[in-house]
Amino acid sequence: MGGASVLPMKDLVALFGRLGFAEARSYIQSGNVVFKGSRPQALSLAKRIPEELAMSHGFKTRMILLALEEMEEALSSNPFPEGEEDPKSLNIYFLAGNPSKPDMESLEQVKSSSERFSLLGKVFYLYAPDGVGRSKLAASVERRLGVEATARNLRTTLAALKIARDLL
């Protein structure tokens, strides 16, 4: 999930349960919910969850769904292994689709001298050793790529992956 509205994770997990995903799990107040289900079920859920939240909590949100294999592939393809030393310095942006016209030149212009980035398919990696919170690039990735995204630091991504593997 992405967006500025705050929703207690227990409420979000409960919503997954009401929609038939009793084994849903969350990781802190990250917007990440891990659940077990088929691809068709998950695709249906991607529409139903935002609709339910609009009705029950009065705000719009979006969901970006990832299969376990997609998370594993994103982690194994990490072009910045040095980010593993400080997992908060590496943000992984999971994109809603492949960018059709990413503005890589403007990304290059806005990045700081210490930042590095890479776009690999539907995943954008930002290594920001001076902190993602200070990054001008981090705040403009979606706009410059032209596609919706959700970003998680390496620590959160690894935690969500562990929860997903534990559900198997």
What are these regions (language model features)?
Residues 1-168:
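Surface-exposed, charge/polar-rich loops and edge strands
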